[in-house]
Amino acid sequence: MKKVLLTFGLCATVLASNAQNFSSPTWTQTQTVYKQKSDAVNSAPVTITADGDVIVSSSFNTGTLSVGGLVVRAVAKSSYIQKLNAAGTSQWAVALLGAAEVKSLTSDTDGNIYAVGVFADKVTLTTKTGTTAATLQGNSGTTKSSLFVLKYSKDGALLAYKSATSSVDATVGASEKYFYDASEAAYVRSTKAVWANNKLYFNAQYTGVSSLNGVELKGDYLDYESFMYVDIPRMSVLSVSASDLSGLTKEYTVKSDLSGMQEQAGVSSLNFAVNNGTLYVASVATGPVIVETSNKTETLNAGKDGDSFNYGFIYSEVGSTTNNKLFDGGKLATLNSNNSINDLLVDDSNVYVAGTYNTNNVFGQSVTFQGGSDSFVAAFAKGTTNVQWVVNSGVNEGDATKYAEKVTGLVVADNKLLLTGYTEETSTHTVKDGFVYNVTTSGTKTSAGSNVVLGLASDSKQVVTSGVNELNSVFNGYALSNTTGINQLTETNDVVRNGNVFSFEKAQDAVVVDLQGRVVLRASNTTNLSVDNLVKGVYVLKVGTKAVKFVK
Protein backbone atom coordinates (compact mmCIF):
# COMPACT_ATOMS: atom_id res chain seq x y z
CA MET A 1 0.00 0.00 0.00
CA LYS A 2 1.31 3.47 -0.88
CA LYS A 3 1.61 6.05 1.85
CA VAL A 4 1.85 9.82 2.18
CA LEU A 5 4.21 11.30 4.73
CA LEU A 6 3.65 15.00 5.37
CA THR A 7 6.53 16.38 7.44
CA PHE A 8 5.74 19.80 8.87
CA GLY A 9 8.95 21.84 8.78
CA LEU A 10 10.18 22.31 12.35
CA CYS A 11 7.50 20.05 13.82
CA ALA A 12 8.75 16.70 15.10
CA THR A 13 5.60 14.70 14.47
CA VAL A 14 4.75 13.14 11.13
CA LEU A 15 1.42 12.88 9.34
CA ALA A 16 0.77 9.92 7.05
CA SER A 17 -1.83 9.26 4.38
CA ASN A 18 -2.82 6.18 2.40
CA ALA A 19 -2.76 8.12 -0.84
CA GLN A 20 0.75 8.79 -2.21
CA ASN A 21 4.40 8.73 -1.17
CA PHE A 22 5.92 11.90 0.31
CA SER A 23 8.95 11.91 2.58
CA SER A 24 9.17 15.71 2.96
CA PRO A 25 7.49 18.88 1.68
CA THR A 26 8.45 19.94 -1.81
CA TRP A 27 8.23 23.53 -0.58
CA THR A 28 7.68 25.49 2.61
CA GLN A 29 6.64 29.11 3.11
CA THR A 30 7.27 30.46 6.63
CA GLN A 31 6.55 33.94 7.97
CA THR A 32 6.92 35.45 11.45
CA VAL A 33 3.47 36.84 12.21
CA TYR A 34 2.86 36.94 15.98
CA LYS A 35 4.38 38.83 18.91
CA GLN A 36 3.80 35.94 21.31
CA LYS A 37 2.46 32.41 21.11
CA SER A 38 -0.81 33.32 22.81
CA ASP A 39 -1.61 35.71 19.92
CA ALA A 40 -1.94 32.85 17.44
CA VAL A 41 -5.25 32.49 15.57
CA ASN A 42 -6.42 28.93 14.92
CA SER A 43 -7.39 29.73 11.34
CA ALA A 44 -5.25 30.00 8.20
CA PRO A 45 -7.26 29.19 5.05
CA VAL A 46 -5.66 27.92 1.86
CA THR A 47 -6.92 27.17 -1.64
CA ILE A 48 -5.48 26.11 -5.00
CA THR A 49 -6.52 27.82 -8.23
CA ALA A 50 -7.38 26.17 -11.54
CA ASP A 51 -3.85 27.00 -12.74
CA GLY A 52 -2.27 25.34 -9.72
CA ASP A 53 -1.30 28.53 -7.90
CA VAL A 54 -1.65 28.49 -4.12
CA ILE A 55 -3.51 31.19 -2.18
CA VAL A 56 -2.91 31.44 1.57
CA SER A 57 -3.90 33.74 4.41
CA SER A 58 -2.77 34.35 7.97
CA SER A 59 -3.35 36.80 10.78
CA PHE A 60 -0.43 38.94 12.00
CA ASN A 61 0.31 41.47 14.72
CA THR A 62 4.09 41.54 14.83
CA GLY A 63 5.11 45.10 13.99
CA THR A 64 6.23 45.34 10.37
CA LEU A 65 5.25 42.55 7.99
CA SER A 66 7.33 42.00 4.87
CA VAL A 67 5.88 39.33 2.61
CA GLY A 68 5.66 38.90 -1.16
CA GLY A 69 6.94 42.43 -1.84
CA LEU A 70 4.41 43.93 0.59
CA VAL A 71 5.73 45.89 3.58
CA VAL A 72 3.11 47.08 6.10
CA ARG A 73 2.69 47.64 9.81
CA ALA A 74 0.04 45.70 11.69
CA VAL A 75 -3.03 47.50 13.01
CA ALA A 76 -4.58 45.45 15.82
CA LYS A 77 -4.52 41.82 14.64
CA SER A 78 -4.50 42.23 10.88
CA SER A 79 -4.49 39.67 8.05
CA TYR A 80 -2.75 39.18 4.74
CA ILE A 81 -3.56 37.22 1.58
CA GLN A 82 -0.61 35.85 -0.38
CA LYS A 83 -0.30 34.19 -3.76
CA LEU A 84 2.34 31.50 -4.30
CA ASN A 85 3.02 29.63 -7.48
CA ALA A 86 2.72 25.84 -7.52
CA ALA A 87 6.33 25.58 -6.34
CA GLY A 88 5.66 27.75 -3.29
CA THR A 89 7.41 30.88 -4.58
CA SER A 90 5.74 34.11 -3.49
CA GLN A 91 4.09 36.14 -6.26
CA TRP A 92 2.40 38.94 -4.33
CA ALA A 93 0.56 39.78 -1.13
CA VAL A 94 -2.07 42.25 0.05
CA ALA A 95 -3.09 43.17 3.59
CA LEU A 96 -6.25 43.81 5.57
CA LEU A 97 -5.06 46.31 8.17
CA GLY A 98 -7.25 46.35 11.27
CA ALA A 99 -9.01 43.69 13.31
CA ALA A 100 -9.77 41.41 10.35
CA GLU A 101 -9.68 37.65 9.87
CA VAL A 102 -9.97 35.81 6.56
CA LYS A 103 -12.12 32.71 7.10
CA SER A 104 -12.26 31.17 3.62
CA LEU A 105 -10.61 31.48 0.20
CA THR A 106 -11.77 30.23 -3.18
CA SER A 107 -11.07 30.96 -6.85
CA ASP A 108 -12.66 30.74 -10.28
CA THR A 109 -11.45 29.26 -13.57
CA ASP A 110 -9.85 32.58 -14.58
CA GLY A 111 -7.69 32.65 -11.47
CA ASN A 112 -9.63 35.40 -9.70
CA ILE A 113 -9.56 35.04 -5.92
CA TYR A 114 -12.42 35.48 -3.45
CA ALA A 115 -12.18 35.89 0.32
CA VAL A 116 -14.79 36.06 3.06
CA GLY A 117 -14.24 36.84 6.70
CA VAL A 118 -15.02 39.01 9.68
CA PHE A 119 -13.78 42.35 10.96
CA ALA A 120 -14.27 44.99 13.64
CA ASP A 121 -14.26 48.76 13.52
CA LYS A 122 -12.27 50.01 10.51
CA VAL A 123 -10.16 47.95 8.11
CA THR A 124 -7.92 49.21 5.31
CA LEU A 125 -7.51 46.99 2.24
CA THR A 126 -4.07 47.53 0.72
CA THR A 127 -2.59 47.09 -2.72
CA LYS A 128 0.45 44.89 -3.36
CA THR A 129 2.68 47.87 -2.54
CA GLY A 130 0.91 48.73 0.70
CA THR A 131 -1.08 51.73 -0.46
CA THR A 132 -4.79 52.01 0.32
CA ALA A 133 -7.14 50.28 -2.12
CA ALA A 134 -10.35 50.63 -0.07
CA THR A 135 -11.64 51.04 3.47
CA LEU A 136 -14.27 48.97 5.27
CA GLN A 137 -16.27 50.43 8.16
CA GLY A 138 -17.85 48.11 10.71
CA ASN A 139 -19.20 48.36 14.22
CA SER A 140 -16.95 50.17 16.67
CA GLY A 141 -15.21 48.13 19.35
CA THR A 142 -13.07 45.02 19.23
CA THR A 143 -15.65 42.32 18.50
CA LYS A 144 -15.40 40.98 14.94
CA SER A 145 -19.10 41.27 14.17
CA SER A 146 -19.06 42.53 10.57
CA LEU A 147 -18.74 40.60 7.32
CA PHE A 148 -16.53 41.25 4.28
CA VAL A 149 -16.55 39.70 0.81
CA LEU A 150 -13.58 40.47 -1.45
CA LYS A 151 -12.56 39.74 -5.04
CA TYR A 152 -9.00 40.04 -6.37
CA SER A 153 -7.61 39.46 -9.83
CA LYS A 154 -4.99 36.76 -10.32
CA ASP A 155 -2.45 39.60 -10.31
CA GLY A 156 -3.58 40.91 -6.91
CA ALA A 157 -5.73 43.88 -7.93
CA LEU A 158 -8.82 44.50 -5.80
CA LEU A 159 -11.72 44.12 -8.24
CA ALA A 160 -14.73 44.33 -5.91
CA TYR A 161 -15.56 44.39 -2.21
CA LYS A 162 -18.67 44.28 -0.07
CA SER A 163 -19.31 44.47 3.66
CA ALA A 164 -22.25 44.13 6.02
CA THR A 165 -22.68 45.41 9.57
CA SER A 166 -25.49 44.41 11.91
CA SER A 167 -27.38 46.46 14.49
CA VAL A 168 -30.07 45.73 17.05
CA ASP A 169 -33.62 45.96 15.73
CA ALA A 170 -34.87 49.48 16.51
CA THR A 171 -38.09 48.31 18.17
CA VAL A 172 -36.26 45.76 20.31
CA GLY A 173 -33.56 48.25 21.27
CA ALA A 174 -36.16 50.80 22.40
CA SER A 175 -38.18 48.28 24.42
CA GLU A 176 -36.10 48.39 27.64
CA LYS A 177 -36.11 44.59 27.49
CA TYR A 178 -32.80 44.23 25.65
CA PHE A 179 -29.84 43.83 28.01
CA TYR A 180 -27.00 42.80 25.71
CA ASP A 181 -24.03 44.78 24.43
CA ALA A 182 -25.17 45.61 20.91
CA SER A 183 -21.62 45.52 19.51
CA GLU A 184 -21.33 41.87 20.56
CA ALA A 185 -24.89 40.56 20.21
CA ALA A 186 -25.60 41.92 16.71
CA TYR A 187 -23.37 40.31 14.10
CA VAL A 188 -23.14 38.89 10.58
CA ARG A 189 -20.37 36.36 9.90
CA SER A 190 -19.20 33.86 7.30
CA THR A 191 -16.83 30.91 7.39
CA LYS A 192 -16.95 29.43 3.87
CA ALA A 193 -16.99 30.58 0.25
CA VAL A 194 -17.34 28.53 -2.95
CA TRP A 195 -17.22 29.72 -6.56
CA ALA A 196 -19.57 27.86 -8.90
CA ASN A 197 -21.93 28.62 -11.80
CA ASN A 198 -20.48 32.16 -12.13
CA LYS A 199 -21.70 32.87 -8.61
CA LEU A 200 -19.92 33.26 -5.31
CA TYR A 201 -21.69 31.20 -2.65
CA PHE A 202 -20.98 31.78 1.04
CA ASN A 203 -22.60 30.86 4.33
CA ALA A 204 -23.72 33.45 6.87
CA GLN A 205 -24.82 33.44 10.47
CA TYR A 206 -26.56 36.64 11.52
CA THR A 207 -28.44 38.30 14.35
CA GLY A 208 -29.96 41.76 14.57
CA VAL A 209 -30.57 43.59 11.30
CA SER A 210 -28.10 44.00 8.46
CA SER A 211 -28.18 44.22 4.68
CA LEU A 212 -25.95 43.30 1.77
CA ASN A 213 -26.49 44.77 -1.67
CA GLY A 214 -29.82 46.15 -0.45
CA VAL A 215 -31.17 42.78 0.72
CA GLU A 216 -32.07 42.56 4.41
CA LEU A 217 -30.54 39.90 6.63
CA LYS A 218 -32.48 39.78 9.87
CA GLY A 219 -32.14 37.48 12.84
CA ASP A 220 -34.92 36.59 15.25
CA TYR A 221 -35.75 37.66 18.80
CA LEU A 222 -37.32 35.52 21.49
CA ASP A 223 -39.43 37.53 23.93
CA TYR A 224 -38.46 35.38 26.89
CA GLU A 225 -41.32 35.27 29.43
CA SER A 226 -42.21 38.84 28.36
CA PHE A 227 -39.20 39.94 30.41
CA MET A 228 -36.29 40.19 27.97
CA TYR A 229 -35.43 39.83 24.31
CA VAL A 230 -32.94 37.11 23.39
CA ASP A 231 -31.13 37.04 20.04
CA ILE A 232 -31.80 33.93 17.95
CA PRO A 233 -29.49 33.67 14.92
CA ARG A 234 -30.44 32.58 11.44
CA MET A 235 -28.07 30.81 9.07
CA SER A 236 -28.12 30.97 5.29
CA VAL A 237 -26.29 30.02 2.15
CA LEU A 238 -26.14 33.23 0.11
CA SER A 239 -24.90 33.96 -3.40
CA VAL A 240 -23.78 37.05 -5.29
CA SER A 241 -22.67 37.62 -8.86
CA ALA A 242 -19.06 36.54 -9.20
CA SER A 243 -18.33 39.30 -11.70
CA ASP A 244 -18.75 42.23 -9.32
CA LEU A 245 -20.25 40.76 -6.12
CA SER A 246 -23.58 42.44 -6.93
CA GLY A 247 -27.06 41.18 -6.10
CA LEU A 248 -27.85 38.79 -3.29
CA THR A 249 -29.85 35.56 -3.35
CA LYS A 250 -30.87 33.61 -0.27
CA GLU A 251 -30.29 30.13 -1.63
CA TYR A 252 -31.05 28.37 1.65
CA THR A 253 -32.02 29.54 5.14
CA VAL A 254 -32.57 27.84 8.49
CA LYS A 255 -34.44 29.89 11.09
CA SER A 256 -36.22 29.19 14.37
CA ASP A 257 -39.96 28.57 14.47
CA LEU A 258 -40.81 31.06 17.23
CA SER A 259 -44.47 30.12 17.52
CA GLY A 260 -44.95 28.92 21.07
CA MET A 261 -41.21 28.82 21.75
CA GLN A 262 -40.33 29.51 25.38
CA GLU A 263 -36.66 28.52 25.38
CA GLN A 264 -33.62 29.56 23.42
CA ALA A 265 -32.98 27.16 20.54
CA GLY A 266 -32.29 27.21 16.83
CA VAL A 267 -29.61 26.52 14.24
CA SER A 268 -26.04 26.51 15.53
CA SER A 269 -23.88 25.30 12.64
CA LEU A 270 -24.16 25.07 8.84
CA ASN A 271 -21.90 24.19 5.94
CA PHE A 272 -22.42 23.50 2.25
CA ALA A 273 -21.04 22.44 -1.13
CA VAL A 274 -22.10 23.13 -4.73
CA ASN A 275 -21.74 20.60 -7.52
CA ASN A 276 -23.17 20.63 -11.05
CA GLY A 277 -25.84 23.17 -10.10
CA THR A 278 -27.00 21.36 -6.97
CA LEU A 279 -26.56 22.85 -3.51
CA TYR A 280 -25.82 20.43 -0.66
CA VAL A 281 -26.28 21.67 2.91
CA ALA A 282 -25.83 20.12 6.34
CA SER A 283 -26.65 21.82 9.63
CA VAL A 284 -27.23 21.26 13.35
CA ALA A 285 -30.24 22.69 15.20
CA THR A 286 -32.32 22.33 18.34
CA GLY A 287 -36.03 22.94 18.71
CA PRO A 288 -38.40 23.60 15.81
CA VAL A 289 -36.72 25.21 12.80
CA ILE A 290 -37.93 26.28 9.37
CA VAL A 291 -35.90 25.48 6.25
CA GLU A 292 -36.53 27.86 3.35
CA THR A 293 -35.43 27.65 -0.28
CA SER A 294 -36.86 29.16 -3.45
CA ASN A 295 -39.09 26.12 -3.99
CA LYS A 296 -39.87 24.81 -0.52
CA THR A 297 -40.57 25.84 3.08
CA GLU A 298 -40.54 23.05 5.66
CA THR A 299 -40.63 22.87 9.47
CA LEU A 300 -38.39 20.30 11.14
CA ASN A 301 -38.17 19.44 14.83
CA ALA A 302 -36.02 16.90 16.68
CA GLY A 303 -38.23 17.33 19.75
CA LYS A 304 -37.25 16.90 23.38
CA ASP A 305 -36.00 14.25 25.77
CA GLY A 306 -37.63 15.28 29.04
CA ASP A 307 -36.78 18.93 29.54
CA SER A 308 -33.79 18.84 27.17
CA PHE A 309 -33.88 19.64 23.47
CA ASN A 310 -32.70 16.91 21.16
CA TYR A 311 -30.11 17.87 18.56
CA GLY A 312 -31.23 17.55 14.97
CA PHE A 313 -28.73 16.91 12.16
CA ILE A 314 -30.28 18.23 8.94
CA TYR A 315 -29.22 17.24 5.43
CA SER A 316 -30.58 18.92 2.28
CA GLU A 317 -30.21 18.73 -1.50
CA VAL A 318 -31.39 21.83 -3.35
CA GLY A 319 -31.88 21.92 -7.10
CA SER A 320 -35.09 22.23 -9.09
CA THR A 321 -36.64 20.67 -5.99
CA THR A 322 -35.57 20.60 -2.34
CA ASN A 323 -35.19 17.43 -0.29
CA ASN A 324 -34.63 17.84 3.45
CA LYS A 325 -34.15 15.16 6.07
CA LEU A 326 -33.80 15.61 9.83
CA PHE A 327 -31.90 13.00 11.82
CA ASP A 328 -32.63 12.92 15.55
CA GLY A 329 -29.28 13.02 17.33
CA GLY A 330 -30.78 12.78 20.79
CA LYS A 331 -29.82 14.99 23.70
CA LEU A 332 -26.33 16.01 24.75
CA ALA A 333 -24.31 13.26 26.36
CA THR A 334 -22.02 15.80 28.10
CA LEU A 335 -22.54 19.20 29.70
CA ASN A 336 -21.12 21.16 26.74
CA SER A 337 -22.37 21.02 23.17
CA ASN A 338 -19.84 20.41 20.42
CA ASN A 339 -22.09 19.55 17.51
CA SER A 340 -20.92 21.21 14.32
CA ILE A 341 -20.72 20.86 10.55
CA ASN A 342 -17.29 21.94 9.34
CA ASP A 343 -17.03 20.87 5.71
CA LEU A 344 -18.80 19.20 2.79
CA LEU A 345 -17.21 17.51 -0.21
CA VAL A 346 -18.84 16.04 -3.33
CA ASP A 347 -17.66 13.39 -5.79
CA ASP A 348 -19.49 11.58 -8.56
CA SER A 349 -21.43 9.29 -6.22
CA ASN A 350 -21.43 10.68 -2.70
CA VAL A 351 -21.59 13.80 -0.58
CA TYR A 352 -19.23 13.72 2.40
CA VAL A 353 -20.06 15.70 5.54
CA ALA A 354 -17.40 16.36 8.20
CA GLY A 355 -17.96 17.77 11.66
CA THR A 356 -18.04 17.01 15.37
CA TYR A 357 -20.67 15.56 17.71
CA ASN A 358 -21.32 14.64 21.34
CA THR A 359 -24.84 13.31 21.07
CA ASN A 360 -25.94 9.67 21.06
CA ASN A 361 -26.43 9.59 17.29
CA VAL A 362 -25.02 11.47 14.32
CA PHE A 363 -27.02 11.50 11.08
CA GLY A 364 -29.03 8.53 12.28
CA GLN A 365 -26.05 6.36 13.15
CA SER A 366 -25.36 5.26 16.72
CA VAL A 367 -21.61 5.86 17.02
CA THR A 368 -20.10 6.21 20.49
CA PHE A 369 -17.82 9.22 20.92
CA GLN A 370 -14.87 9.51 23.30
CA GLY A 371 -13.96 12.35 25.69
CA GLY A 372 -15.71 15.67 25.09
CA SER A 373 -16.68 14.93 21.47
CA ASP A 374 -15.62 13.10 18.33
CA SER A 375 -14.99 14.20 14.78
CA PHE A 376 -16.83 12.34 12.04
CA VAL A 377 -17.29 11.89 8.32
CA ALA A 378 -20.70 10.86 6.97
CA ALA A 379 -21.34 9.79 3.38
CA PHE A 380 -24.65 10.42 1.60
CA ALA A 381 -25.62 8.98 -1.77
CA LYS A 382 -26.10 11.80 -4.27
CA GLY A 383 -29.70 12.30 -5.28
CA THR A 384 -30.98 10.89 -1.99
CA THR A 385 -30.91 11.64 1.72
CA ASN A 386 -29.63 8.14 2.47
CA VAL A 387 -26.60 7.77 4.74
CA GLN A 388 -24.10 5.26 3.36
CA TRP A 389 -21.79 5.21 6.37
CA VAL A 390 -20.44 7.24 9.29
CA VAL A 391 -16.94 6.98 10.76
CA ASN A 392 -15.76 8.76 13.90
CA SER A 393 -12.32 9.71 15.19
CA GLY A 394 -12.48 7.83 18.48
CA VAL A 395 -10.00 10.29 20.00
CA ASN A 396 -10.28 10.53 23.79
CA GLU A 397 -9.08 14.07 24.44
CA GLY A 398 -9.79 13.87 28.17
CA ASP A 399 -12.22 15.61 30.53
CA ALA A 400 -15.48 16.16 28.63
CA THR A 401 -16.05 19.44 30.48
CA LYS A 402 -12.70 20.88 29.39
CA TYR A 403 -11.77 19.51 25.97
CA ALA A 404 -13.33 19.07 22.55
CA GLU A 405 -12.39 18.37 18.93
CA LYS A 406 -12.36 20.72 15.93
CA VAL A 407 -12.33 19.72 12.25
CA THR A 408 -10.16 21.92 10.01
CA GLY A 409 -10.20 20.24 6.61
CA LEU A 410 -11.60 17.55 4.34
CA VAL A 411 -10.12 16.98 0.88
CA VAL A 412 -9.60 14.19 -1.63
CA ALA A 413 -6.05 13.00 -2.32
CA ASP A 414 -5.78 10.18 -4.86
CA ASN A 415 -9.43 9.19 -4.46
CA LYS A 416 -9.19 8.99 -0.67
CA LEU A 417 -10.48 11.43 1.93
CA LEU A 418 -8.03 13.27 4.15
CA LEU A 419 -9.55 14.63 7.38
CA THR A 420 -7.62 17.01 9.65
CA GLY A 421 -8.35 18.68 12.97
CA TYR A 422 -7.22 19.14 16.54
CA THR A 423 -8.33 18.89 20.16
CA GLU A 424 -8.56 22.05 22.23
CA GLU A 425 -9.12 23.33 25.74
CA THR A 426 -12.58 24.84 25.35
CA SER A 427 -12.38 27.83 27.70
CA THR A 428 -9.28 29.35 26.07
CA HIS A 429 -9.37 27.54 22.69
CA THR A 430 -5.77 26.48 23.27
CA VAL A 431 -4.73 23.70 20.89
CA LYS A 432 -3.81 20.46 22.64
CA ASP A 433 -3.11 17.84 19.94
CA GLY A 434 -3.68 17.39 16.24
CA PHE A 435 -5.17 14.45 14.37
CA VAL A 436 -5.17 13.27 10.77
CA TYR A 437 -7.24 10.45 9.31
CA ASN A 438 -7.45 8.75 5.96
CA VAL A 439 -10.95 7.62 5.09
CA THR A 440 -11.62 5.55 2.01
CA THR A 441 -14.70 6.35 -0.04
CA SER A 442 -16.23 3.13 1.31
CA GLY A 443 -15.81 4.30 4.91
CA THR A 444 -12.63 2.63 6.16
CA LYS A 445 -10.68 4.87 8.57
CA THR A 446 -6.94 4.87 9.27
CA SER A 447 -5.22 7.05 11.87
CA ALA A 448 -2.42 9.00 10.20
CA GLY A 449 -0.65 11.14 12.77
CA SER A 450 -1.02 13.95 15.26
CA ASN A 451 0.04 17.11 13.45
CA VAL A 452 -2.00 20.27 13.94
CA VAL A 453 -3.30 21.32 10.50
CA LEU A 454 -5.28 24.57 10.38
CA GLY A 455 -5.99 24.72 6.65
CA LEU A 456 -6.04 22.09 3.91
CA ALA A 457 -6.36 22.12 0.11
CA SER A 458 -5.55 19.73 -2.73
CA ASP A 459 -5.57 19.44 -6.48
CA SER A 460 -4.39 16.76 -8.89
CA LYS A 461 -0.72 17.56 -8.23
CA GLN A 462 -0.27 18.43 -4.57
CA VAL A 463 -1.69 18.78 -1.08
CA VAL A 464 -1.20 22.13 0.70
CA THR A 465 -1.41 22.59 4.46
CA SER A 466 -1.24 25.54 6.84
CA GLY A 467 -0.27 25.71 10.48
CA VAL A 468 1.41 27.74 13.19
CA ASN A 469 4.84 26.97 14.64
CA GLU A 470 5.72 29.15 17.62
CA LEU A 471 5.40 32.73 16.22
CA ASN A 472 5.32 31.70 12.57
CA SER A 473 2.73 30.85 9.97
CA VAL A 474 3.83 27.76 8.04
CA PHE A 475 2.51 26.68 4.63
CA ASN A 476 3.70 23.40 3.08
CA GLY A 477 3.19 21.77 -0.30
CA TYR A 478 3.48 18.02 -0.92
CA ALA A 479 3.67 16.78 -4.50
CA LEU A 480 1.52 13.80 -5.43
CA SER A 481 3.42 10.75 -6.63
CA ASN A 482 3.89 10.27 -10.35
CA THR A 483 3.10 6.58 -9.93
CA THR A 484 -0.61 7.24 -10.35
CA GLY A 485 -0.03 8.78 -13.77
CA ILE A 486 -1.83 11.93 -12.66
CA ASN A 487 1.05 14.10 -13.88
CA GLN A 488 1.10 12.56 -17.35
CA LEU A 489 -1.10 15.29 -18.77
CA THR A 490 -0.81 14.66 -22.49
CA GLU A 491 -3.34 13.12 -24.84
CA THR A 492 -2.30 9.71 -26.13
CA ASN A 493 -3.26 7.71 -29.18
CA ASP A 494 -5.53 5.41 -27.18
CA VAL A 495 -7.42 8.34 -25.60
CA VAL A 496 -9.08 10.51 -28.25
CA ARG A 497 -11.36 13.50 -27.69
CA ASN A 498 -14.15 14.48 -30.07
CA GLY A 499 -16.01 17.49 -28.69
CA ASN A 500 -17.23 16.53 -25.23
CA VAL A 501 -16.77 12.78 -25.76
CA PHE A 502 -13.57 10.85 -25.01
CA SER A 503 -13.05 7.51 -26.77
CA PHE A 504 -10.72 4.73 -25.62
CA GLU A 505 -8.94 2.06 -27.63
CA LYS A 506 -10.29 -0.67 -25.36
CA ALA A 507 -12.92 -0.93 -22.63
CA GLN A 508 -11.58 0.20 -19.27
CA ASP A 509 -12.45 2.18 -16.13
CA ALA A 510 -12.42 5.98 -16.39
CA VAL A 511 -12.44 8.69 -13.71
CA VAL A 512 -12.63 12.49 -14.06
CA VAL A 513 -11.33 14.66 -11.21
CA ASP A 514 -11.32 18.44 -10.84
CA LEU A 515 -8.24 20.42 -9.83
CA GLN A 516 -9.22 20.11 -6.18
CA GLY A 517 -8.85 16.34 -6.55
CA ARG A 518 -12.58 15.65 -6.30
CA VAL A 519 -14.06 12.84 -8.40
CA VAL A 520 -16.80 14.38 -10.56
CA LEU A 521 -17.45 11.58 -13.05
CA ARG A 522 -16.80 7.85 -13.15
CA ALA A 523 -17.53 4.99 -15.56
CA SER A 524 -16.62 1.30 -15.50
CA ASN A 525 -15.57 -0.94 -18.41
CA THR A 526 -16.42 1.62 -21.08
CA THR A 527 -14.98 2.64 -24.46
CA ASN A 528 -16.24 6.23 -24.34
CA LEU A 529 -17.11 8.89 -21.80
CA SER A 530 -19.19 12.05 -22.25
CA VAL A 531 -18.25 15.12 -20.17
CA ASP A 532 -21.14 17.15 -21.54
CA ASN A 533 -22.80 17.53 -18.13
CA LEU A 534 -19.73 18.92 -16.37
CA VAL A 535 -19.59 22.62 -15.59
CA LYS A 536 -16.93 24.68 -17.38
CA GLY A 537 -13.49 24.21 -15.87
CA VAL A 538 -10.21 22.33 -15.96
CA TYR A 539 -10.24 18.58 -15.28
CA VAL A 540 -8.06 15.48 -15.40
CA LEU A 541 -9.31 12.28 -17.06
CA LYS A 542 -7.69 9.13 -15.66
CA VAL A 543 -8.02 6.05 -17.87
CA GLY A 544 -6.15 2.97 -16.78
CA THR A 545 -2.58 4.14 -16.16
CA LYS A 546 -2.91 7.28 -18.27
CA ALA A 547 -4.12 10.77 -17.48
CA VAL A 548 -5.26 13.61 -19.72
CA LYS A 549 -5.77 17.21 -18.64
CA PHE A 550 -8.63 18.93 -20.47
CA VAL A 551 -10.76 22.06 -20.45
CA LYS A 552 -14.55 21.85 -20.63
Region locations from a protein language model:
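Glycine-centered tight-turn motifs at strand-turn-strand junctions
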Residues: 519-534
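Well-ordered beta-strand positions in beta-sheet-rich domains
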Residues: 93, 477, 528, 547-549
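Terminal processing/anchoring signals of secreted or surface-associated proteins
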Residues: 482-494, 512, 517, 539-541, ...
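Residue-level detector of functionally pivotal "anchor" positions at catalytic/ligand-binding pockets or at interdomain
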Residues: 476-508
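Bacterial Sec-dependent N-terminal signal peptides
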Residues: 1-24
